[in-house]
Protein backbone atom coordinates (compact mmCIF):
# COMPACT_ATOMS: atom_id res chain seq x y z
CA UNK A 1 0.00 0.00 0.00
CA UNK A 2 1.10 3.56 -0.75
CA UNK A 3 0.43 4.97 2.72
CA UNK A 4 0.97 8.63 1.81
CA UNK A 5 -1.45 8.35 -1.09
CA UNK A 6 -4.03 6.58 1.08
CA UNK A 7 -3.81 9.25 3.77
CA UNK A 8 -4.66 11.82 1.09
CA UNK A 9 -7.55 9.74 -0.32
CA UNK A 10 -8.90 7.88 2.72
CA UNK A 11 -12.51 8.32 1.58
CA UNK A 12 -11.94 5.47 -0.90
CA UNK A 13 -11.65 3.16 2.12
CA UNK A 14 -10.07 -0.30 2.11
CA UNK A 15 -11.35 -3.79 1.39
CA UNK A 16 -11.65 -6.60 3.93
CA UNK A 17 -8.64 -8.26 2.32
CA UNK A 18 -6.54 -5.10 2.63
CA UNK A 19 -7.72 -4.58 6.19
CA UNK A 20 -6.67 -8.10 7.19
CA UNK A 21 -3.30 -7.63 5.46
CA UNK A 22 -2.70 -4.48 7.51
CA UNK A 23 -3.31 -6.36 10.76
CA UNK A 24 -0.91 -9.09 9.64
CA UNK A 25 1.75 -6.62 8.42
CA UNK A 26 4.47 -6.10 11.03
CA UNK A 27 7.12 -4.67 8.70
CA UNK A 28 5.09 -1.53 7.97
CA UNK A 29 3.87 -0.95 11.53
CA UNK A 30 5.08 2.64 11.77
CA UNK A 31 3.76 3.46 8.31
CA UNK A 32 0.33 2.19 9.40
CA UNK A 33 0.37 4.21 12.62
CA UNK A 34 1.59 7.34 10.85
CA UNK A 35 -1.00 7.00 8.09
CA UNK A 36 -3.79 6.77 10.66
CA UNK A 37 -2.45 9.80 12.52
CA UNK A 38 -2.41 11.82 9.28
CA UNK A 39 -6.01 10.83 8.50
CA UNK A 40 -7.13 11.74 12.00
CA UNK A 41 -5.42 15.14 11.72
CA UNK A 42 -7.29 15.80 8.47
CA UNK A 43 -10.61 14.92 10.14
CA UNK A 44 -10.21 16.22 13.69
CA UNK A 45 -7.20 18.52 13.53
CA UNK A 46 -5.22 18.78 16.74
CA UNK A 47 -8.33 18.60 18.93
CA UNK A 48 -8.51 15.81 21.50
CA UNK A 49 -11.83 15.65 23.29
CA UNK A 50 -12.98 14.35 26.65
CA UNK A 51 -16.27 14.21 28.55
CA UNK A 52 -16.95 14.94 32.21
CA UNK A 53 -19.12 11.99 33.20
CA UNK A 54 -19.95 9.49 35.88
CA UNK A 55 -20.33 5.74 35.45
CA UNK A 56 -23.00 4.10 37.59
CA UNK A 57 -22.86 0.29 37.57
CA UNK A 58 -26.09 -0.20 39.50
CA UNK A 59 -25.92 -3.95 40.14
CA UNK A 60 -23.41 -6.78 39.88
CA UNK A 61 -26.13 -9.42 40.21
CA UNK A 62 -26.37 -11.21 36.88
CA UNK A 63 -27.79 -14.41 35.43
CA UNK A 64 -25.49 -14.17 32.41
CA UNK A 65 -22.68 -16.59 31.65
CA UNK A 66 -20.07 -14.37 30.00
CA UNK A 67 -16.76 -16.15 30.48
CA UNK A 68 -14.71 -12.95 30.38
CA UNK A 69 -16.63 -11.25 33.20
CA UNK A 70 -15.32 -11.02 36.75
CA UNK A 71 -17.95 -8.44 37.77
CA UNK A 72 -21.06 -10.62 38.04
CA UNK A 73 -22.17 -12.47 41.15
CA UNK A 74 -25.24 -14.51 42.07
CA UNK A 75 -28.18 -13.01 43.97
CA UNK A 76 -27.12 -14.47 47.34
CA UNK A 77 -23.39 -13.74 47.07
CA UNK A 78 -21.83 -11.78 49.94
CA UNK A 79 -20.61 -9.12 47.50
CA UNK A 80 -23.93 -8.75 45.67
CA UNK A 81 -25.34 -5.24 45.47
CA UNK A 82 -28.24 -3.42 43.85
CA UNK A 83 -28.59 0.36 43.82
CA UNK A 84 -32.26 1.33 43.74
CA UNK A 85 -33.59 4.00 41.36
CA UNK A 86 -33.80 6.65 44.11
CA UNK A 87 -30.12 6.16 45.01
CA UNK A 88 -29.14 6.23 41.33
CA UNK A 89 -30.93 9.58 41.11
CA UNK A 90 -28.87 10.85 44.06
CA UNK A 91 -25.65 9.71 42.38
CA UNK A 92 -26.68 11.55 39.20
CA UNK A 93 -27.45 14.68 41.24
CA UNK A 94 -23.97 14.49 42.85
CA UNK A 95 -22.43 14.08 39.40
CA UNK A 96 -24.26 17.12 38.04
CA UNK A 97 -23.14 19.21 41.02
CA UNK A 98 -19.55 18.20 40.29
CA UNK A 99 -19.83 19.41 36.69
CA UNK A 100 -20.71 16.18 34.88
CA UNK A 101 -22.69 16.50 31.67
CA UNK A 102 -23.41 12.76 31.37
CA UNK A 103 -24.20 9.73 33.48
CA UNK A 104 -23.54 6.29 32.00
CA UNK A 105 -25.82 3.73 33.66
CA UNK A 106 -25.35 -0.02 33.15
CA UNK A 107 -25.74 -3.12 35.27
CA UNK A 108 -25.98 -6.88 35.38
CA UNK A 109 -28.97 -8.95 34.29
CA UNK A 110 -30.91 -9.37 37.53
CA UNK A 111 -34.16 -11.32 37.20
CA UNK A 112 -36.34 -8.43 38.35
CA UNK A 113 -35.09 -5.98 35.73
CA UNK A 114 -37.76 -5.05 33.23
CA UNK A 115 -38.61 -1.97 31.19
CA UNK A 116 -40.63 -0.54 34.09
CA UNK A 117 -37.61 -0.68 36.41
CA UNK A 118 -35.36 0.83 33.74
CA UNK A 119 -37.95 3.58 33.21
CA UNK A 120 -38.05 4.25 36.95
CA UNK A 121 -34.27 4.69 36.94
CA UNK A 122 -34.55 7.18 34.08
CA UNK A 123 -37.36 9.10 35.77
CA UNK A 124 -35.47 9.33 39.06
CA UNK A 125 -32.36 10.67 37.30
CA UNK A 126 -34.42 13.23 35.39
CA UNK A 127 -36.26 14.30 38.53
CA UNK A 128 -33.14 14.50 40.71
CA UNK A 129 -31.12 16.57 38.22
CA UNK A 130 -33.93 18.79 36.91
CA UNK A 131 -33.27 21.58 39.48
CA UNK A 132 -29.71 21.78 38.14
CA UNK A 133 -30.76 21.78 34.48
CA UNK A 134 -30.83 18.02 33.92
CA UNK A 135 -28.11 15.65 32.76
CA UNK A 136 -27.60 13.52 29.65
CA UNK A 137 -28.58 9.90 30.31
CA UNK A 138 -26.47 7.34 28.43
CA UNK A 139 -27.82 3.99 29.59
CA UNK A 140 -28.55 0.30 29.06
CA UNK A 141 -26.62 -1.90 26.65
CA UNK A 142 -28.35 -3.78 23.81
CA UNK A 143 -28.26 -6.89 26.01
CA UNK A 144 -29.90 -5.04 28.90
CA UNK A 145 -32.62 -3.76 26.56
CA UNK A 146 -33.23 -7.26 25.18
CA UNK A 147 -33.39 -8.77 28.69
CA UNK A 148 -35.74 -6.10 30.05
CA UNK A 149 -37.99 -6.15 26.99
CA UNK A 150 -38.40 -9.94 27.23
CA UNK A 151 -39.20 -9.68 30.95
CA UNK A 152 -41.85 -7.08 30.08
CA UNK A 153 -43.34 -8.96 27.11
CA UNK A 154 -42.45 -6.13 24.73
CA UNK A 155 -40.70 -6.08 21.38
CA UNK A 156 -37.46 -4.13 21.05
CA UNK A 157 -38.97 -1.09 19.35
CA UNK A 158 -41.72 -0.80 21.98
CA UNK A 159 -39.16 -1.04 24.79
CA UNK A 160 -36.89 1.57 23.25
CA UNK A 161 -39.77 3.97 22.65
CA UNK A 162 -40.83 3.69 26.31
CA UNK A 163 -37.26 4.24 27.51
CA UNK A 164 -36.88 7.25 25.23
CA UNK A 165 -40.14 8.75 26.50
CA UNK A 166 -38.87 8.38 30.07
CA UNK A 167 -35.57 10.14 29.49
CA UNK A 168 -33.11 7.84 27.71
CA UNK A 169 -30.93 10.07 25.52
CA UNK A 170 -28.33 7.68 24.10
CA UNK A 171 -27.33 4.04 24.52
CA UNK A 172 -23.92 2.37 25.00
CA UNK A 173 -23.01 0.05 22.13
CA UNK A 174 -21.56 -2.43 24.57
CA UNK A 175 -22.31 -6.19 24.72
CA UNK A 176 -20.80 -6.35 21.22
CA UNK A 177 -17.59 -8.12 22.31
CA UNK A 178 -16.74 -9.71 18.92
CA UNK A 179 -19.64 -9.79 16.47
CA UNK A 180 -19.15 -13.37 15.35
CA UNK A 181 -21.48 -16.11 16.59
CA UNK A 182 -18.79 -18.80 16.74
CA UNK A 183 -16.70 -16.60 19.02
CA UNK A 184 -19.77 -15.62 21.05
CA UNK A 185 -20.70 -19.29 21.56
CA UNK A 186 -17.43 -19.74 23.47
CA UNK A 187 -17.15 -16.29 25.03
CA UNK A 188 -20.72 -15.47 26.06
CA UNK A 189 -23.04 -18.38 25.16
CA UNK A 190 -26.34 -16.92 26.37
CA UNK A 191 -25.73 -13.36 25.26
CA UNK A 192 -27.61 -11.87 22.34
CA UNK A 193 -26.48 -13.00 18.87
CA UNK A 194 -24.67 -10.87 16.33
CA UNK A 195 -27.91 -10.45 14.40
CA UNK A 196 -29.78 -9.38 17.54
CA UNK A 197 -27.11 -6.85 18.50
CA UNK A 198 -27.25 -5.31 15.04
CA UNK A 199 -31.05 -5.22 15.08
CA UNK A 200 -31.25 -3.51 18.48
CA UNK A 201 -28.65 -0.90 17.57
CA UNK A 202 -30.31 -0.15 14.23
CA UNK A 203 -33.73 0.03 15.88
CA UNK A 204 -32.38 2.47 18.46
CA UNK A 205 -31.05 4.67 15.67
CA UNK A 206 -34.36 4.53 13.82
CA UNK A 207 -36.34 5.71 16.87
CA UNK A 208 -33.89 8.55 17.47
CA UNK A 209 -31.56 7.06 20.07
CA UNK A 210 -27.92 7.32 19.02
CA UNK A 211 -25.42 4.78 20.30
CA UNK A 212 -21.72 4.28 20.70
CA UNK A 213 -19.99 1.19 19.29
CA UNK A 214 -17.44 -1.09 20.92
CA UNK A 215 -15.25 -4.13 20.33
CA UNK A 216 -13.55 -6.27 22.97
CA UNK A 217 -10.42 -7.97 21.62
CA UNK A 218 -7.38 -9.87 22.87
CA UNK A 219 -9.04 -13.11 24.03
CA UNK A 220 -9.92 -15.92 21.57
CA UNK A 221 -10.55 -14.00 18.37
CA UNK A 222 -8.32 -13.85 15.29
CA UNK A 223 -7.64 -10.83 13.11
CA UNK A 224 -10.27 -11.98 10.62
CA UNK A 225 -12.91 -11.67 13.35
CA UNK A 226 -11.77 -8.15 14.20
CA UNK A 227 -11.95 -7.17 10.54
CA UNK A 228 -15.47 -8.55 10.13
CA UNK A 229 -16.55 -6.76 13.31
CA UNK A 230 -15.21 -3.43 12.07
CA UNK A 231 -16.97 -3.83 8.73
CA UNK A 232 -20.28 -4.57 10.49
CA UNK A 233 -19.96 -1.29 12.42
CA UNK A 234 -19.07 0.60 9.26
CA UNK A 235 -22.08 -0.83 7.41
CA UNK A 236 -24.43 0.11 10.28
CA UNK A 237 -23.09 3.66 10.28
CA UNK A 238 -23.42 3.99 6.52
CA UNK A 239 -27.06 2.91 6.81
CA UNK A 240 -28.17 4.85 9.90
CA UNK A 241 -25.56 7.47 10.82
CA UNK A 242 -26.44 6.79 14.46
CA UNK A 243 -23.03 5.83 15.89
CA UNK A 244 -21.33 8.65 17.82
CA UNK A 245 -18.00 6.93 18.49
CA UNK A 246 -16.03 3.69 18.36
CA UNK A 247 -14.42 2.43 21.57
CA UNK A 248 -12.00 -0.52 21.26
CA UNK A 249 -11.80 -2.38 24.57
CA UNK A 250 -8.69 -4.42 25.33
CA UNK A 251 -9.55 -7.68 27.14
CA UNK A 252 -8.77 -7.49 30.87
CA UNK A 253 -7.56 -11.02 31.52
CA UNK A 254 -6.25 -11.16 35.09
CA UNK A 255 -9.50 -12.11 36.83
CA UNK A 256 -11.45 -13.34 33.80
CA UNK A 257 -12.66 -16.97 34.16
CA UNK A 258 -11.92 -17.84 30.52
CA UNK A 259 -8.28 -16.84 31.05
CA UNK A 260 -7.56 -18.57 34.34
CA UNK A 261 -9.21 -21.71 32.97
CA UNK A 262 -6.59 -21.62 30.21
CA UNK A 263 -8.97 -20.96 27.32
CA UNK A 264 -7.97 -17.44 26.30
CA UNK A 265 -4.77 -15.53 25.79
CA UNK A 266 -3.66 -12.88 28.25
CA UNK A 267 -4.97 -9.82 26.50
CA UNK A 268 -3.58 -7.92 23.56
CA UNK A 269 -0.05 -6.59 23.15
CA UNK A 270 0.59 -2.86 23.08
CA UNK A 271 1.35 -3.19 19.37
CA UNK A 272 -2.03 -4.83 18.77
CA UNK A 273 -3.75 -2.04 20.69
CA UNK A 274 -2.16 0.62 18.49
CA UNK A 275 -2.94 -1.36 15.34
CA UNK A 276 -6.62 -1.55 16.31
CA UNK A 277 -6.79 2.24 16.69
CA UNK A 278 -4.84 2.88 13.51
CA UNK A 279 -6.54 0.41 11.19
CA UNK A 280 -9.97 1.38 12.53
CA UNK A 281 -9.20 4.99 11.58
CA UNK A 282 -7.95 3.94 8.15
CA UNK A 283 -11.15 1.95 7.57
CA UNK A 284 -13.68 4.32 9.13
CA UNK A 285 -12.16 7.61 7.99
CA UNK A 286 -14.82 10.14 8.92
CA UNK A 287 -17.70 7.64 8.60
CA UNK A 288 -17.25 7.03 12.32
CA UNK A 289 -15.49 10.28 13.10
CA UNK A 290 -14.64 9.66 16.74
CA UNK A 291 -12.42 6.89 18.11
CA UNK A 292 -11.91 6.75 21.86
CA UNK A 293 -9.01 5.36 23.87
CA UNK A 294 -9.90 3.50 27.06
CA UNK A 295 -7.42 4.88 29.61
CA UNK A 296 -8.84 2.60 32.32
CA UNK A 297 -7.79 -0.46 30.33
CA UNK A 298 -4.65 0.83 28.59
CA UNK A 299 -3.10 3.11 31.19
CA UNK A 300 -2.18 6.73 30.53
CA UNK A 301 0.99 6.28 28.46
CA UNK A 302 -0.45 3.75 26.01
CA UNK A 303 -3.63 5.83 25.77
CA UNK A 304 -1.46 8.80 24.80
CA UNK A 305 0.15 6.67 22.10
CA UNK A 306 -3.30 5.69 20.82
CA UNK A 307 -4.10 9.38 20.41
CA UNK A 308 -1.16 9.61 18.00
CA UNK A 309 -2.32 6.55 16.05
CA UNK A 310 -5.78 7.52 14.85
CA UNK A 311 -7.82 8.06 18.02
CA UNK A 312 -9.13 11.53 18.89
CA UNK A 313 -11.02 11.14 22.17
CA UNK A 314 -9.71 10.45 25.67
CA UNK A 315 -13.03 9.31 27.07
CA UNK A 316 -14.45 10.36 30.40
CA UNK A 317 -13.65 11.20 33.98
CA UNK A 318 -15.82 8.18 34.93
CA UNK A 319 -15.75 8.69 38.75
CA UNK A 320 -16.42 4.95 39.21
CA UNK A 321 -15.92 2.08 36.80
CA UNK A 322 -16.37 -1.25 38.53
CA UNK A 323 -16.41 -3.66 35.59
CA UNK A 324 -12.82 -3.15 34.38
CA UNK A 325 -11.66 -2.96 38.01
CA UNK A 326 -13.24 -6.35 38.79
CA UNK A 327 -11.47 -7.88 35.80
CA UNK A 328 -8.06 -6.70 36.99
CA UNK A 329 -7.57 -3.25 35.47
CA UNK A 330 -5.15 -1.32 37.66
CA UNK A 331 -5.12 2.19 36.23
CA UNK A 332 -7.78 3.74 38.45
CA UNK A 333 -11.43 4.60 37.99
CA UNK A 334 -11.39 8.40 38.17
CA UNK A 335 -9.41 11.14 36.51
CA UNK A 336 -10.30 14.80 36.96
CA UNK A 337 -10.80 17.11 34.00
CA UNK A 338 -7.66 19.11 34.81
CA UNK A 339 -5.55 15.95 34.89
CA UNK A 340 -7.03 14.82 31.57
CA UNK A 341 -6.18 18.21 30.04
CA UNK A 342 -2.60 17.87 31.29
CA UNK A 343 -2.31 14.39 29.77
CA UNK A 344 -3.53 15.73 26.41
CA UNK A 345 -1.32 18.84 26.55
CA UNK A 346 1.70 16.63 27.25
CA UNK A 347 1.44 15.09 23.76
CA UNK A 348 0.83 18.40 21.99
CA UNK A 349 -2.93 17.99 21.66
CA UNK A 350 -5.57 20.67 22.12
CA UNK A 351 -7.88 19.45 24.92
CA UNK A 352 -11.55 20.27 24.52
CA UNK A 353 -14.43 19.28 26.77
CA UNK A 354 -17.34 17.83 24.81
CA UNK A 355 -20.84 16.55 25.40
CA UNK A 356 -22.09 13.07 24.49
CA UNK A 357 -22.79 14.16 20.90
CA UNK A 358 -19.28 15.62 20.53
CA UNK A 359 -20.41 19.22 20.66
CA UNK A 360 -17.53 21.27 22.07
CA UNK A 361 -18.49 22.93 25.36
CA UNK A 362 -15.74 25.54 25.62
Swiss-Prot record:
Catalytic activities: 5-amino-6-(D-ribitylamino)uracil + L-tyrosine + S-adenosyl-L-methionine = 5-amino-5-(4-hydroxybenzyl)-6-(D-ribitylimino)-5,6-dihydrouracil + 2-iminoacetate + 5'-deoxyadenosine + L-methionine + H(+)
Radical SAM core domain sequence ranges: 48-294
Annotated cofactor note: Binds 1 [4Fe-4S] cluster. The cluster is coordinated with 3 cysteines and an exchangeable S-adenosyl-L-methionine.
Lineage: Archaea, Methanobacteriati, Methanobacteriota, Methanomada group, Methanococci
Alphabetized NCBIfam families for the sequence: CofH family radical SAM protein, F420_cofH, PRK07360.1
Residues that, per the record, bind [4Fe-4S] cluster: 62, 66, 69
Cofactor: [4Fe-4S] cluster
Example of a GO MF term: iron ion binding
Quaternary data: Consists of two subunits, CofG and CofH.
Protein's organism: Methanococcus aeolicus (strain ATCC BAA-1280 / DSM 17508 / OCM 812 / Nankai-3)
Enzyme class per UniProt: transferase
Positions of disulphide bridges: none
Full protein name: 5-amino-6-(D-ribitylamino)uracil--L-tyrosine 4-hydroxyphenyl transferase
Signal peptide (from-to): none
Keyword Transmembrane annotated: no
Record's keyword terms, sorted: 4Fe-4S, Iron, Iron-sulfur, Metal-binding, S-adenosyl-L-methionine, Transferase
SMART domains named among the record's database cross-references: Elp3
Family as reported in the entry's similarity comment: Belongs to the radical SAM superfamily. CofH family.
Annotated EC: 2.5.1.147
Pathway the protein acts in: Cofactor biosynthesis; coenzyme F0 biosynthesis
SUPFAM superfamilies: Radical SAM enzymes
Superkingdom of the source species: Archaea
Matching InterPro entries: Aldolase_TIM, CofH/MnqC-like_C, CofH_family, Elp3/MiaA/NifB-like_rSAM, F420, FO_synthase_su2, rSAM
Record function comment: Catalyzes the radical-mediated synthesis of 5-amino-5-(4-hydroxybenzyl)-6-(D-ribitylimino)-5,6-dihydrouracil from 5-amino-6-(D-ribitylamino)uracil and L-tyrosine.
Amino acid sequence: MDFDSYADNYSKSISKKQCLELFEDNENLFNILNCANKINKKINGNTITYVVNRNINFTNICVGDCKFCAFKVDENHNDAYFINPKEIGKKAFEAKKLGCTEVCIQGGLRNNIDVELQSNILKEVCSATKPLGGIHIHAFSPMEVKFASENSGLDIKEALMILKENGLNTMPGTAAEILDDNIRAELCPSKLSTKEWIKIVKTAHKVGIKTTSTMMYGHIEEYKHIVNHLFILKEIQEETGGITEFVPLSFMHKMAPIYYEGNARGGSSGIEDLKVYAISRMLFGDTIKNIQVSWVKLGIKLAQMGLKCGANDFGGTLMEENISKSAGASYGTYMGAEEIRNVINAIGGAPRERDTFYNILE
